[in-house]
């Protein structure tokens, strides 16, 4: 789990904070939204203490020597395929077994881990990360929609002002023409 989604979540929070700091200084609402999202993330981390304890137990036991290989040693030319997590097998460990595939790939063996706790912790932290990411995207979409609505209202206001100015100029021109013709 070291180097997994919590690091990505922290990076995302930092990039959002930096983005807001480089943006307009008058956008206090966005600062509040980001602060609220960071607080929500810390609360979700605090609420998952039970999951963290499971993770610490897994790290302290003999099965902790197995690590997730999230960045597999594959060349980057493979395209947009996501790396598949693999478990390293500890020699002489009783809960990992080998299963032979009887087909075209005779002799190839697949390693499986029978420790569901590790998978459950990884799955729940990914779900928390996805929920947090969706919440951030929803807030950003709301902010973009609010800005767009404000710009549309501003454009409508300018059109009304332009129409009013043109009407005043046309009336003044007609009045000047009438006065000129009467002299």
Swiss-Prot record:
- Which keywords has UniProt assigned to this entry? Apoptosis, Endoplasmic reticulum, Membrane, Mitochondrion, Mitochondrion outer membrane, Transmembrane, Transmembrane helix
Region entry Disordered, spans: 42-66
Q: InterPro entries recorded for this chain? A: FATE1, Mff-like_dom
Question: Mutating residue 151 to D leads to what result?
Answer: Impairs association with mitochondria
Please give the start and end residues of each transmembrane region: 163-181
Compartments in which it is found: Mitochondrion; Mitochondrion outer membrane; Endoplasmic reticulum membrane
Q: Which cysteines are joined by disulfide bonds?
A: none
The yes or no answer to whether the keyword Membrane is present is yes
Which Gene Ontology terms of cellular component type are present?
A: endoplasmic reticulum; endoplasmic reticulum membrane; mitochondria-associated endoplasmic reticulum membrane contact site; mitochondrial outer membrane
Topology in membrane: Single-pass membrane protein
Q: Which Pfam families match?
A: Miff
User: Where does the source fall among the domains of life?
Assistant: Eukaryota
Instruction: Tell me the outcome of changing residue 125 to R.
Output: In fertile and infertile individuals
Please name the GO terms that the record assigns under molecular function.
identical protein binding; ubiquitin protein ligase binding
A biological process term (GO) from this entry = negative regulation of mitochondrial calcium ion concentration
What is the tissue localization of expression for this protein?
Testis-specific in fetus (aged from 6 to 11 weeks). In adult, expressed predominantly in testis, with some expression in lung, heart, kidney, adrenal gland and whole brain. Highly expressed in certain types of cancer tissues such as hepatocellular carcinoma, colon and gastric cancer. Weakly expressed in normal pancreas.
Function, as annotated: Involved in the regulation of endoplasmic reticulum (ER)-mitochondria coupling. Negatively regulates the ER-mitochondria distance and Ca(2+) transfer from ER to mitochondria possibly implicating it in the regulation of apoptosis. May collaborate with RNF183 to restrain BIK protein levels thus regulating apoptotic signaling.
Provide the assembly information: Interacts with BIK and RNF183. Interacts with IMMT/MIC60and EMD.
Q: What protein name applies here?
A: Fetal and adult testis-expressed transcript protein
């Amino acid at each position: 789990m070291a180097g997994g989604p919590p690091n990505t979540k922290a990076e995302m929070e930092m990039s959002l904070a930096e983005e807001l700091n480089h943006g307009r200084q008058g956008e206090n609402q966005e600062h509040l939204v980001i602060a609220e999202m960071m607080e929500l993330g810390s609360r979700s981390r605090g609420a998952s203490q039970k999951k963290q304890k499971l993770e610490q137990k897994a790290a302290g036991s003999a099965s902790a020597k197995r690590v997730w290989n999230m960045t597999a040693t594959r060349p980057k030319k493979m395209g947009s395929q996501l790396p598949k997590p693999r478990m390293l097998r500890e020699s002489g460990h009783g809960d990992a077994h080998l299963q032979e595939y009887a087909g075209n790939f005779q002799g190839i063996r697949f390693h499986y881990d029978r420790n569901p706790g590790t998978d459950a912790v990884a799955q729940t932290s990914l779900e928390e990360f996805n929920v947090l990411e969706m919440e951030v995207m929803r807030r950003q979409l709301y902010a973009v929609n609010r800005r767009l609505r404000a710009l549309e209202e501003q454009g409508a206001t300018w059109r009304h002002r332009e129409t009013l100015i043109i009407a005043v100029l046309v009336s003044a021109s007609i009045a000047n023409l009438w006065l000129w013709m009467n002299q």
